[in-house]
Regions:
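Catalytic machinery of carbohydrate-active enzymes
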Residues: 1-362
């Protein structure tokens, strides 16, 4: 037992390790020589980011920094959607009772809790870690774990501070973790190709129009007539247009596809959705999961925004943010509160089309 290398990246403790199954090696051979596959783990790092899939994707730039600063580390990530995590995460963990029990029973060198959800902060309090950053609980109240998280904390409890913020989300979370953001990009594994290839011409530039923004956020909706007009205008300019969306957008997209005579392949799994986005050269989109997929796949983007602070978004030089010509008072509000008008009615098709043309230029 004394010769077991439990600090090896391949050691499991419950089943034979990969090198043993493949090469029949032991941690130390009969001559006392260590296994040639021995890979000692440095820091054990746990990220807690449960939330929405888009939030998980836009947190992945941290992985690049962590692997740069701690190349021998083993990174664990606890989330509601482990299937979206890239291969750079050594140990993806679903937010389930078995996972929680295990994490509560083992030590970490560094814990990064980037969620303010009470369950995430409660778990962060209970896990044994030499260093904790992000958010935690104090007498049942969510508070910053260190001074580095105070500014991000304040933007979440005071609207005026949030509106005045000029830092992007990656800058904020890097600062929370004690790092400086240097343009580290999203980490998103290439999507699986569809069993049946998408029926796209292959000769034209493809523009995807993601028409939805979630049922809750009606303040962000752009009218169907605008999407239809934009699709027609893009077709006239020689682009191939494909509509994107989930189950909530199915009826809308079916209607727009018929009216504008553009392609719509229906809604499917997240992997298939990502595969279709990957075929696009440019995506026009509101602030949604699809926005983060688009950025993660390195596609050009025109982002429609009205209720969020535009400084929050890091587009990595991939596109533009377009906003209504009239001021919007619906900051973080799910329904429009502007007296007398809906601000999204003052985001013209011509304005969005011009942005598409600018973004698509070499």
């Amino acid at each position: 037992m004394a010769t077991l290398k439990t600090d090896c990246r391949f050691f499991r403790g419950t089943v034979p390790c990969g090198p043993h199954k493949k090469h029949q090696v032991h941690c130390v051979d009969e001559a006392g020589r260590p296994c040639s596959h021995y890979d000692r783990i440095g820091k054990e790092i746990l990220i807690i980011k449960l939330g929405a899939i888009g939030d998980v994707i836009r947190t992945t730039p941290l992985l690049r920094k962590l692997k740069d600063v701690h190349p021998d580390s083993r990174i664990w990530w606890l989330t509601l959607t482990p299937e979206i995590l890239p291969k750079l995460v050594d140990e993806p963990m679903a937010f389930t009772l078995p996972s929680i029990l295990y994490l509560q029973s083992r030590p970490f060198d560094l814990l990064l809790n980037l969620d303010k959800d009470r369950e995430a902060c409660a778990l962060a309090e209970q896990i044994d870690a030499k260093e904790k950053k992000g958010f935690r609980l104090d007498k049942g109240i969510v508070v910053p774990a260190t001074a580095e998280s105070e500014q991000k904390y304040l933007t979440g409890i005071f609207d005026d501070i949030s509106k005045a913020n000029t830092k992007s989300y990656p800058v904020e979370i890097f600062e929370m973790c004690g790092f400086q953001f240097n343009g580290e990009q999203y980490v998103l594994d290439a999507p699986e190709p569809p069993k049946t290839p998408w029926t796209l011409s292959g000769k034209k530039r493809v523009v995807g129009l993601n028409t939805g923004c979630g049922a809750r956020w009606t303040s962000r909706l752009w009218a169907d007539k605008n999407w239809t007009a934009l699709a027609r205008a893009l077709k006239r300019k020689g682009y191939e247009v494909v509509l994107l969306g989930g189950e909530q957008e199915h009826a809308k997209n079916t209607k727009i596809a018929r009216a504008a005579k553009v392609k719509y392949f229906g809604h499917s799994s997240l992997q298939m959705f990502m595969s279709l986005v990957d075929r696009c050269d440019l995506v026009v989109i509101a602030v949604t999961l699809a926005m983060h997929v688009t950025i993660g796949l390195g596609k050009k983007i025109v982002l429609l925004n009205n209720i969020f602070n535009k400084h929050e978004f890091e587009l990595y030089g991939l596109g533009e943010i377009v906003e209504p010509s009239k001021p919007c008072r619906c900051f973080f509000k799910p329904t429009c509160v502007n007296p007398g008008y809906r601000c999204m009615e003052h985001l013209s098709v011509e304005h969005v089309l011009s942005a598409c043309v600018r973004v698509r230029k070499p």
